[in-house]
Amino acid sequence: MEIPKFLFITVIAIGLSGSLTWANPLANPEAEATAEAGPEAEAVAEAVGEAEPLLPLIPILASLIAAIKSG
């Protein structure tokens, strides 16, 4: 199965943009406010932080599934 060039470029671009967003130190500008809000807010912020790296995988997987079905 041959992967179209645009699909390959799209997957790389989405992956890079996601990793750049995670590495940005300004990604969580309200870190001090979260710490002051209490343990519940810290638990929610931690859960969101753990789930965030999975979000860019959704369009990548969708595009790969579409490529497999069309090919």
Curated annotation (Swiss-Prot):
Residues 1-23 form the signal peptide. The keyword Hydrolase does not apply. One of its GO terms (molecular function) is toxin activity. Residues 24-53 form a propeptide. It comes from the Eukaryota. Keywords: Amidation, Ion channel impairing toxin, Neurotoxin, Secreted, Signal, Toxin, Voltage-gated sodium channel impairing toxin. It is found in: Secreted. Negative results: does not exhibit hemolytic and cytotoxic activities on HEK293 cells. Belongs to the formicidae venom clade 1 family. GO terms for cellular component: extracellular region. This is Myrmicitoxin(1)-Pm4a. Expressed by the venom gland. The keyword Secreted applies. The modification Serine amide is found at S70. Toxin that causes a rapid paralysis when intrathoracically injected into insects (blowflies). Does not cause spontaneous nocifensive behaviors by intraplantar injection in mice.
